[in-house]
């Protein structure tokens, strides 16, 4: 409540360890991408080996099903080891919902895939 969303155009990996930390919206206009992160989710960059980065975030599998210019959280599927992470994403805490991009109605980890994308999580 009264918190402001941080915004950056710099493409870089980041981690949020504290589930009470302010959610962060990352905008990458050169790729047409927008990322929203909170509650222990780690987004990977070229400097992060995928295995170690995803392990530290508690993510056991990630499937990116989008073409360039269309990627946002709606096109990503996460499998998470710890249900605490899911509870934080699905919470009714106003500070999480107030920082969502306008096209999101509420945070969710049960996400859709873009047309023509195969389910890589099998």
UniProtKB/Swiss-Prot annotation:
Residues 1-30, 96-122 are annotated as: Disordered. It comes from the Eukaryota. This is Putative uncharacterized protein SLIRP-OT1.
